Curated annotation (Swiss-Prot):
One of its GO terms (biological process) is translation. GO terms for cellular component: chloroplast; small ribosomal subunit. This is Small ribosomal subunit protein uS14c. Keywords: Chloroplast, Plastid, Ribonucleoprotein, Ribosomal protein, RNA-binding, rRNA-binding. It holds the Pfam family Ribosomal_S14.
Amino acid sequence: MARKGLIEREKKRKKLEQKYHSIRGSSKKEIRKVPSLSDKWEIHGKLQSPPRNSAPVRLHRRCFLTGRPRANYRDFGLSGHVLREMVQACLLPGATRSSW
């Protein structure tokens, strides 16, 4: 189980990312359109003004049961060991264990 503080920090980052998403997107489009290098540097400075935690790169996918940030399966939103336990307990319909 992940610490509650880390999970809350992740929620805060997600809110910040949603808040500044349009600003970052518009700045990136402007950089692509502007031909002169000096104007690109100016727009790049604007792109650096939002907080660091508003960058989408800083977000992690977490298991929604345990909060574990690693070994997540996107299709299920679960970490690997939780997914395996749920499949063994037949809690995920349609998922089967491989056997050969």
